[in-house]
Structure formats: C-alpha cells, structure tokens
Amino acid sequence: MDRNLEHVQNIVKDMADFASGSYFIYGGRLFPYDENDFCKEEGCTIQQENIFGDIHTFYVMPDGGKIFEGDLEIATIGDYFSDFYDIDYVIGSDKKYKACRVLVAFGGPNIYIDTWDRQVQLEWWGEHAEAHIPNDLCEQIDGFFEMVYNC
C-alpha cells in the first residue's frame, strides 16, 4: 500500500478513535483507553473495591495515590484538533457554518481535514492521497468546529 494513502487512512482511524472515546487524558498526556497500556506506561496496578455495594475500578499509582476510573478525562474529537495550524470555514449566505478545511500538518506533507469533501487530503511534492471520512465522524468534526466558529 502506498505510504501516503496508509498515512491518511491512519488519520481517519485516529480521529474515529478520539470520537469514540478510545483515549483518555491523564497528567496532560494522552493514553489509549486500555487499562493494561496505561498501567504498563505509568507503573500502576488495577484494583477493584466495593463502595456502598457498587464495584469501582481504580488505579494504584507508584506513589500510592488512587485514580478512580470515573475520574479519567475521556478525550474527544476536540482534543484531537487542539493543535491545528489553520482553518478555512465554508459559510453560507445566511452566515451559518457549513463545513471546514483544517490544516493539521504542513511543510512535508501538507495534510488537511476537509469536511465539505469528507476527506483527509495529503499533498507533498506532486503526490496526492486522500481517505474518506465517514459521515458520523464528519458530523462530529463539524459539530466541534461549528461551536468554535460561533464562539
């Protein structure tokens, strides 16, 4: 498979993972929502405790501190776009948001998330690759950027 095509397909997969709650944020860092990966990285152990008849999962950190699973911040599609370079909005004659084109990488290759065309687009030295963004994911991206536009 072409390296550029694989790259844009991986971007679509990463965005879908963010949108589905497959990542969480702890200590300002991003982790897959997989307790084994988190504990391997942080050196913690997983325990469960019965609290007033409910079973709660928590992580015991190396310093002895406890983090309850419910206290972890689930990453959203907005977190995926927390560090973009530029954005072009498509605005209707009624001045309402319609779509956007977000520059997420540049300088080799340039990569855009385009919700009008529903594609991740990569361009680099005459090479071009694109991957389709599923409708439900595109709607989540548009929902986030419509909120940003209206702020």
Where are the language model's segments positioned?
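Acidic interaction surfaces
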Residues: 1-151
